[in-house]
């Protein structure tokens, strides 16, 4: 499960192994151009499906080796001359930095090869050098790969480096208190957080990346945090004073885990806010200002938080029911509330929507997303003051808005159309004022197109595309020439995968517990003999607030499961993937249907997909399995305890065993309270959301997989589950695999190989005999 709250508790074995990740030496594939039609809203344009290469022999059957080789691109960054794109390309938990020409003339080339972490990527002013941070150190590497990465500083390296908008300078800190290490909170989840290190005065400095000159800006006693540039690139803001957060470690042996296992409970203790300051980047006295209410909603940081030199945006949520937007003023005036959304249930828009307020680059407009009409839509309002204007309308979601460099257009992605699991890129163009905003869709056809990124010259959009026949890749679209087709820049699927053998999903609906239609994606193996009965599997997605897509999932952490389902399909399984109550893509009423009912109708929505499968003449109703990750694992545990004979076998991957236990974890308490209050307020809901309390009902085989370094759903949930199962004499029905050092979303190659092999064998053993 995934939340907007800052991580507060990490749980791991005290003796968890630190994995050694090996890099892959797989050759790059050449970039391919796929044809696509473009047009205004309503035209019958489509992205053509890739053609399978001619084969002289029988089609290749998917293997686990093939699944491991699928790569996943992320975090693309345009060069400042709009000619190249840098991005991360991950294979089995190992990611390196690549560069590809935006015209697709050459295949992507790696500029890092060691798989070491890369963060904060930005291009130098002349687009010949790429900068990034590694272990807090600012690094530089030649964009053409002619020179290996090296530190920018050779002596006394600075920390917390942040680049100016034009890429010519970096501001950084020297001395002062070192922040607490946050290792173990990221994707690899390795643990090992360290306490903050004491220090004296903190100096803010600015270094030129053009000539190497370096100047002191200001020095403050005590720690300095939140260093950033203002939108004009001429000033810096930062916070000083207050009480820095700290990390407290506890060794704990819960009573239900026996006497010989010691767990480390890592608690992130929040600090108190400090004073915000602004200072000229050339140096001088720093001026204190009121930074506004504590932020809590997913607004973007950086330049688009600044309206002009003096005014900035602050978003926050209040009691999980109100989302507010303020305009702050560095001159000392009190922040002004300019917009508020108030919910009866809870603010359910996810961070993935990127719906926070943004200022247009020219400072004229403020954009944000709101679901005030029941759907997540784009709104604009004048930065100088005035009422918001709704830009997109309809029964669809418009997400991830981003301003063009000239401030006249906003690109976004939406699932407008017949399939809620497809998304396309739209453009909102402002002609003079907000009474003249024209919206057009610039991609169409089957597939999921998300996360548009403008080129600095404003002529092209980079975005991610997936569809039923290909996993996520980066594509680029020229928005100045309607006749030009999108260009594919990466090809992340290994050549061994036969796309012609892949199964395309079909959107179906079936009645939920209250009769409301539940959407789901049905996968039927190609060439299936429908005159006989076959086993089937229900896949329950995680997060609660997520969804299935019309093809590969847009997120790597769920795309690997879509890949594995294609593997299961080629082994003869029918698969169904429901979008139960709480899922995104269907409006706020569906998303908020879990309010005060977690583990109630939402669980029934998912579990009743088995009834739909039983209506299919080619599915054996006695051989249906169920599995899920995280929130889906929680539903799986409910399925085997609330509906113990419906499913022949079940696989729980890092599922929540008890919501009262989940509530007690500071990392998850707020998320839980927003949906179901506290255990004291709603004991009935917490009782229904506690599958560990009913494991005496288990009568069918259960496989449990969990990583010890999981902070999203602490590993202790599975330990408590196993303890309860053993005490009820259910040990013969349970298989339990621990992955030392693994995070919530399985990433490392040896873990993926073991998990997929184990799940496949488990289903074969229990559903095919």
Located regions from the model:
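Serine-hydrolase catalytic core recognition
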Residues: 303, 309, 441-444, 448-769
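Short loop/turn segments that connect beta-strands within beta-propeller blades
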Residues: 101-104, 142-146, 209-212, 280-284, ...
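Structural motif
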Residues: 94-98, 137-139, 180-182, 199-203, ...
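Bacterial N-terminal signal peptides
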Residues: 7-19
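Predominantly five- to eight-bladed beta-propeller fold
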Residues: 38-46, 50-51, 175-205, 238-286, ...
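Conserved beta-propeller blade repeats
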Residues: 70-88, 113-133, 155-179, 215-241, ...
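A short helix->beta-strand "capping" segment at the edge of beta-propeller domains
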Residues: 54-71
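Asp-box/WD-like beta-propeller blade repeats and closely related beta-sheet repeat scaffolds
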Residues: 137-139, 143-207, 211-228, 245-247, ...
């Amino acid at each position: 499960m995934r939340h907007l709250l800052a991580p507060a508790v990490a749980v791991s074995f005290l003796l968890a192994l630190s994995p050694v990740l090996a890099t892959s030496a797989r050759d790059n594939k050449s970039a391919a151009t796929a044809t696509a039609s473009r047009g205004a809203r309503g035209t019958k344009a489509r992205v053509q499906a890739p053609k399978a290469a001619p084969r002289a022999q029988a089609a290749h059957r998917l293997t686990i080796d093939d699944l491991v080789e699928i790569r996943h691109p992320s975090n693309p960054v345009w060069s400042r001359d709009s000619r190249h794109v840098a991005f991360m390309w991950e294979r089995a938990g190992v990611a390196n930095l690549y560069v590809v020409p935006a015209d697709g003339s050459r295949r992507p080339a790696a500029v890092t090869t060691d798989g070491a972490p890369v963060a904060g990527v930005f291009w130098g002013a002349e687009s010949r050098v790429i900068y990034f941070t590694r272990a807090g150190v600012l690094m530089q590497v030649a964009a053409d790969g002619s020179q290996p990465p090296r530190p920018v500083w050779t002596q006394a390296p600075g920390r917390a480096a942040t680049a100016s908008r034009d890429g010519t300078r970096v501001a950084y800190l020297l001395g002062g208190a070192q922040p607490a290490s946050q290792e173990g909170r990221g994707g690899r989840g390795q643990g090992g957080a360290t306490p903050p290190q004491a220090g004296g005065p903190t100096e803010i400095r600015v270094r030129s990346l053009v000539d190497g000159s370096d100047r002191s800006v200001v020095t403050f006693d005590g720690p300095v945090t939140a260093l950033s540039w203002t939108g004009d690139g001429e000033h810096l803001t930062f916070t000083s004073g207050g009480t820095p957060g700290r990390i407290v470690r506890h060794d704990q042996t819960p009573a239900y885990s026996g006497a010989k296992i010691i767990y480390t409970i890592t608690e992130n203790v929040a600090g108190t806010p400090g004073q915000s300051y602004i200072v000229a980047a050339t140096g001088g006295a720093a001026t204190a200002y009121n930074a506004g209410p504590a932020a809590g909603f997913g607004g973007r940081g950086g330049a688009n938080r600044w309206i002009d030199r003096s005014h900035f945006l602050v978003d926050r949520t209040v009691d999980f029911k109100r989302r507010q937007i303020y305009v702050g003023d560095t001159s000392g005036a009190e922040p002004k509330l300019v917009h508020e959304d108030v919910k009866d249930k809870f603010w359910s828009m996810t961070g993935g929507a990127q719906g926070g307020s943004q200022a247009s680059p020219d400072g004229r407009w403020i954009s944000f997303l709101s679901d005030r009409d029941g759907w997540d839509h784009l709104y604009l309002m004048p930065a100088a003051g005035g009422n918001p204007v709704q830009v997109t309308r309809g029964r669809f979601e418009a997400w991830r808005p981003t301003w063009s460099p000239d401030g006249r257009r906003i690109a976004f992605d939406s699932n407008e159309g017949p399939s809620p699991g497809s998304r396309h890129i739209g453009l909102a163009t402002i002609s003079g004022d907000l009474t003249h905003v024209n919206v057009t869709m610039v991609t169409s056809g089957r597939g999921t197109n998300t996360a548009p990124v403008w080129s600095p010259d404003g002529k092209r959009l980079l975005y991610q595309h997936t569809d039923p026949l290909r996993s996520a890749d980066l594509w680029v679209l020229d928005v100045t020439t309607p006749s030009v087709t999108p260009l594919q820049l990466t090809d992340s699927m290994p050549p061994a995968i036969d796309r012609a053998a892949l199964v395309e999903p079909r959107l179906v609906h079936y009645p939920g517990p209250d009769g409301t239609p539940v959407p789901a994606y049905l996968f039927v193996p190609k060439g299936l003999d429908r005159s006989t009965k076959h086993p089937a599997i229900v896949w329950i997605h995680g997060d609660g607030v997520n969804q299935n897509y019309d093809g590969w999932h847009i997120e790597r952490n769920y795309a690997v499961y879509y890949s594995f389902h294609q593997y299961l399909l080629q082994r003869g399984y029918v698969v169904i993937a429901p979008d139960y109550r709480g899922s995104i893509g269907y409006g706020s009423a569906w998303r908020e249907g879990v309010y005060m009912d977690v583990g109630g109708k939402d669980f029934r929505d998912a579990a009743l997909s088995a009834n739909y499968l039983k209506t299919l003449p080619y599915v054996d109703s006695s051989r249906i399995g169920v599995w899920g990750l995280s929130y889906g694992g929680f539903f799986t545990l409910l399925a085997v305890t609330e509906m113990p004979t419906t499913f022949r076998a079940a696989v729980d991957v890092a599922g929540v065993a008890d919501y009262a236990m989940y509530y007690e974890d500071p990392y998850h308490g707020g998320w839980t309270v927003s949906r179901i209050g506290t255990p004291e307020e709603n004991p009935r809901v917490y009782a229904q959301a506690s599958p560990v309390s009913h494991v005496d009902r288990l009568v069918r085989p259960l496989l449990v997989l969990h990583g010890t370094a999981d902070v999203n759903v602490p590993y202790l949930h599975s330990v408590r589950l196993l303890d309860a199962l053993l005490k009820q004499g259910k040990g013969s029905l349970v298989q339990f695999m621990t992955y030392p050092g693994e995070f919530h979303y399985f990433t490392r190659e040896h873990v993926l190989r073991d998990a997929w092999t184990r799940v496949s064998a488990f289903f074969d053993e229990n559903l095919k005999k």
